[in-house]
A protein has these predicted regions:
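Vicinal oxygen chelate
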Residues: 1-5, 29-76, 87-113, 126-141
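Conserved active-site tyrosine of GNAT-family acetyltransferases
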Residues: 18-23, 89, 117
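Conserved hydrophobic/aromatic "anchor" residues
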Residues: 21-22, 26, 96
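Short, conserved charged micro-motifs
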Residues: 82-86
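Short glycine-/small-residue motifs
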Residues: 122
């Protein structure tokens, strides 16, 4: 038996803004979009092999208090050309939370925030270098 992440869900303030953001930044494709009861809207976007579920409960919904939420801390998005992806996202106005860094040889990361406040991690990991860093205990995060 095998497992894989099928989708990740983000609660949106404005589903239109969120769809536009993921299309512009990552070339996401809208696979399904529905209006559901109780002013709820839902959209499934495909980015690579992963589905992103966007949910908008409308203006009457109360936001989740982040101090009481212990769930997902960020969503990792992989790339095979870190420098080109970073330049592309920067040119598109990405809200980076710092500069790119290399926590171990062969691993490059940078964090950014999407319009709803969710944290995204742009990552490029060389599998052999990553495993070597784990084996040697040199991963410094």
């Amino acid at each position: 038996m095998q497992y894989a992440i099928e989708h990740v869900s983000i609660r949106c303030r404005d589903i239109e803004v969120s769809i536009g953001y993921f299309q512009k930044m990552f070339g996401a494709r809208v696979m399904l979009r529905r209006n559901l009861p109780n002013s709820k809207q839902i959209a499934y976007l495909q980015i690579g092999d992963t589905m992103l579920e966007l949910m908008d409960f409308g203006p009457a919904a109360e936001p989740v208090d982040s101090r009481e939420h212990y769930g997902v801390t960020h969503i990792g998005i992989k790339t095979d050309d870190f420098d080109a992806a970073y330049r592309d996202l920067k040119a598109k106005g990405a809200d980076f939370l710092g500069e790119p860094f290399e926590p171990a040889p062969g691993i490059r990361l940078v964090f950014l925030r999407e319009p709803n406040g969710a944290i995204l991690e742009l990552a490029m990991r060389d599998p052999k270098s990553f495993q070597a860093a784990i084996d040697q205990g040199t991963v410094n995060w």
